[in-house]
């Protein structure tokens, strides 16, 4: 007889209602009980992604949830990943591998095929794990997206899994959100909803009780719990760029990051944003790159378009002024490509074939290729006469010819990155390398000679995940969910 697998799907009334965080917390609750648990998200739309053990690509939220489960991330935890590369189009990634580019209408028609991929991955996880915590996408009540849905109730019905609906009370309108979402579901979908969770509550719970009673009476569904607002949680954001936390003590380093239209993997900067002595500022449309010690050009899903956008904002001139005054510039992935002499796209990987003139700050030339590099990397960074171990991951199309000193030596002996002869400009394909304490300390020393004590980024994430799990165990009636 096939062993029963515990499943639960968390759907939300809106985007950013708390689905990712709730699933991560539930995963940690089960992992702490010794349950072999895995996360699953049928379809994700995000520009922040992670590399898996198979050398595939999934949303970063599922990688964090895998960490909460204390397991390695797998492509089957997020079988359909959509990475927007224009206002109407996106790259479609199935089970970790890029398939093609599609517009929204094309993907809508492709969903029936994508569902087969989703169910295949779900079956694989069921064969391997005792429990699967599932995350929906956006809201299940988007009327225009319900046909052939694979992200929310369409999957829940196909896989026959129970559902809870979470809403963010901090935004206001929580009762309308929950009542309205349930009302817009079909009778069979309503039947599989086991209850509601209210997220990010602050205040006296007694003032909420009359509303909870009304909701339960009107819907016939229980409120399984009310989660408090967890200040300073500092988990990686999947989409929205998180603002700078409050600084404490003396600011030793000022960093600015221009927000490109297709910025990707901005989680690279979380370690800077969370440090109490580093002032990290994101600069948006119409703003100038203000005085700083370091300008970082981030990754991009559409490098040539974002290079054009950078120039339209006048940021290229700001960068040159910054360098004249002795500042440092760091480019990561797409930002690294922009720093070179040229970026060519002969195959039309990002749109119309052609070539763009780079910023010319590094002696590199990049050609975008049809194959994507997906790899977790270990090596050594040599900078300022010092050598430290470095870890990170690469997610990019394109190969760069480098005629500069290459400061990173991977464990396989391959050289990576580039450092200008003047020593002010550096680039690398490695995402996540700043998370290493030794690397961050060395980079800060390179920038302006400052010595800071880096925080243990992995430990901070572990503490955040445990805080979520603690709150869930305290405030949710898990017996109603069979957990």
UniProtKB/Swiss-Prot annotation:
What is an example of a GO molecular function annotated in this UniProt entry? ABC-type vitamin B12 transporter activity
Tell me which residues this entry annotates as catalytic.
333, 431
Domain (GATase cobBQ-type) ranges: 252-439
Swiss-Prot/TrEMBL GO biological process terms: cobalamin biosynthetic process
HAMAP family in the cross-refs: CobQ (MF_00028)
This protein's pathway reads: Cofactor biosynthesis; adenosylcobalamin biosynthesis
| Name this protein carries in UniProt | Cobyric acid synthase
Q: What does this protein do?
A: Catalyzes amidations at positions B, D, E, and G on adenosylcobyrinic A,C-diamide. NH(2) groups are provided by glutamine, and one molecule of ATP is hydrogenolyzed for each amidation.
Q: Which Gene3D superfamilies match?
A: 3.40.50.880, P-loop containing nucleotide triphosphate hydrolases (3.40.50.300)
Q: Which family does it belong to?
A: Belongs to the CobB/CobQ family. CobQ subfamily.
Record lineage? Bacteria, Pseudomonadati, Pseudomonadota, Gammaproteobacteria, Vibrionales
Q: Name the UniProt key words of this record, in alphabetical order.
A: Cobalamin biosynthesis, Glutamine amidotransferase
Please give the PANTHER family that the UniProt record associates with this protein.
Answer: COBYRIC ACID SYNTHASE (PTHR21343:SF1), DETHIOBIOTIN SYNTHETASE (PTHR21343)
Q: Which InterPro entries does the UniProt entry name for this protein?
A: Class_I_gatase-like (IPR029062), CobQ/CobB/MinD/ParA_Nub-bd_dom (IPR002586), CobQ_GATase1 (IPR033949), CobQ_N (IPR047045), CobQ_synth (IPR004459), GATase_3 (IPR011698), P-loop_NTPase (IPR027417)
């Amino acid at each position: 007889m096939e062993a029963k697998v515990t499943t639960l799907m968390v759907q939300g009334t809106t985007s950013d209602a708390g689905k990712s965080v709730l699933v991560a917390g539930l995963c940690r609750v089960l992992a702490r009980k010794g349950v072999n648990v895995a996360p699953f998200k049928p379809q994700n739309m995000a520009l922040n992604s992670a590399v898996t053990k198979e050398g595939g690509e999934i949303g970063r939220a599922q990688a964090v949830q895998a960490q909460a489960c204390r397991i390695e991330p797998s492509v089957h935890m997020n079988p359909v990943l959509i990475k927007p590369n224009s206002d109407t189009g996106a790259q479609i990634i199935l089970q970790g591998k890029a398939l093609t580019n599609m517009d929204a209408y094309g993907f809508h028609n492709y969903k029936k095929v994508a569902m087969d991929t989703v169910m295949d991955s779900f079956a694989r996880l069921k064969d391997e794990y005792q429990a699967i915590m599932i995350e929906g996408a956006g809201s299940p009540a988007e009327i225009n997206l319900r046909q052939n849905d694979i992200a929310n109730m369409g999957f829940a019905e196909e896989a026959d899994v129970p559902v809870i609906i979470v809403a963010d009370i901090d935004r206001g309108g929580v009762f309308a959100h929950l009542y309205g979402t349930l009302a817009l579901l079909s009778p069979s979908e309503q039947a599989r909803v086991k209850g509601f969770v209210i997220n990010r509550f602050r205040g006296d719970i007694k003032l909420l009780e009359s509303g909870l009673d009304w909701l339960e009476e009107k819907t016939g569904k229980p409120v399984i719990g009310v989660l408090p607002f967890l200040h300073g949680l500092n988990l990686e954001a999947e989409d929205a760029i998180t603002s700078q936390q409050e600084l404490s003590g003396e600011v030793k380093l000022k960093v600015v990051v221009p927000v490109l239209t297709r910025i990707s993997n901005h989680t690279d900067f979380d370690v800077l944003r969370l440090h109490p002595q580093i002032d990290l500022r994101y600069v948006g449309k119409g703003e100038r790159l203000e005085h700083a010690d370091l300008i970082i050009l981030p990754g991009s899903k559409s490098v040539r378009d974002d290079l054009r956008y950078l120039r339209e904002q006048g940021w290229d001139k700001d960068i040159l002024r910054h360098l004249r005054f002795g500042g440092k510039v760091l480019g990561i992935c797409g930002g690294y490509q922009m720093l070179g002499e040229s970026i060519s796209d002969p195959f039309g990987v990002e749109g119309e074939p052609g070539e763009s003139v780079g910023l010319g700050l590094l002696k590199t030339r990049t050609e975008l290729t049809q194959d994507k590099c997906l790899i977790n990397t270990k090596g050594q960074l040599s900078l300022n006469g010092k050598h430290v171990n470095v870890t990170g991951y690469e997610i990019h199309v394109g190969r760069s010819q480098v005629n500069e000193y290459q400061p990173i030596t991977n464990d396989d002996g391959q050289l990576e990155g580039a450092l200008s002869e003047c020593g002010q400009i550096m680039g690398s394909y490695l995402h996540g390398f700043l998370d290493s304490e030794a690397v961050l300390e060395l980079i800060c020393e390179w920038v302006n000679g400052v010595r800071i004590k880096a925080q243990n980024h992995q430990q901070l994430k572990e503490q955040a995940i445990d805080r979520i799990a603690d709150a869930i165990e305290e405030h949710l009636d898990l017996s109603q969910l069979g957990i």
